[in-house]
Design a protein with these regions (language model features):
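Class I SAM-dependent methyltransferase Rossmann-like catalytic core
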Residues: 2-32, 36
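Conserved class I S-adenosyl-L-methionine
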Residues: 37-47
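Glycine-rich SAM-binding Motif I of class I
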Residues: 49-53
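A short glycine-rich, Lys/Arg-flanked "PGG" loop and its adjoining helix->strand segment in the class I
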Residues: 56-57, 128-142
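S-adenosyl-L-methionine
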Residues: 77-104
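A short acidic, Gly/Pro-enriched loop at the edge of an enzyme's catalytic core
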Residues: 102-114
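Conserved beta-strand signature within the Rossmann-like core of class I S-adenosyl-L-methionine
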Residues: 143-151
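Conserved Class I S-adenosyl-L-methionine
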Residues: 158-176
């Protein structure tokens, strides 16, 4: 079976995750970013772990996925959402990490690091994106992939819509990174 389809066809997934699949297309995202069995992956601001959990299913027992939560998100969720997820849906290769967006505290030597639907949050939360991006590149292996997926704002808007409608202009992110 296709490893990307297999990642979302696993029975032990929350119904809320399964309901997001048609719009979020995690199998296509993980394929696009070339996540493979045995990879070491990090996700910045992983929220409740939707993409991290799917990535953990692809990397398998030989791989590791580090799902980052910031102190702000832990306060907002009244606890670490990744730890809460793991209590109900255990994945032995999914590890919660805590740190600021600028320095997520990933171990060195990751193959891929994702920022999924949260790059715009780094803008409105006033995170130092230069430090964040440099931290990512310092953590990746040579040739590693920094995958950013976010809602695209209309051309010319830059960062103007990051807080109100949670959009950021694609060309702005490409230039900045």
């Amino acid at each position: 079976m296709d490893p990307y389809k297999k990642a979302i066809d696993i029975v032990n997934r929350p119904d809320t995750d399964v309901s997001r699949d048609p719009n979020r297309k995690p199998d296509e995202v993980l394929r696009f970013f070339q996540v493979h069995e045995g990879d070491k992956v990090g996700e910045i601001n992983a929220g409740r772990g939707y993409f991290s959990a799917c990535a953990a299913n692809v990397v398998g027992e030989k791989g590791k996925v580090y799902a980052h939560s910031s102190p702000v998100s832990i306060e907002r969720w009244k606890g670490n959402p990744i730890e809460k997820r793991l209590k109900e849906f255990h994945q032995s290769n999914l590890y919660p990490v805590v740190g600021e967006m600028e320095e997520p505290n990933f171990p060195d030597g990751l193959d891929k690091i994702f920022n999924i639907m949260t790059y715009h949050d780094a803008v409105w939360s006033k995170a130092d994106r230069e430090i964040m991006n440099q931290s990512v590149f310092n953590t990746l292996v040579s040739g590693g992939i920094y995958g950013i997926l976010d809602h695209n704002a209309k051309d010319g808007s830059g960062i103007d819509n990051c807080h109100d409608i949670h959009r950021i202009e694609k060309s702005f992110v490409i230039e900045e990174v």
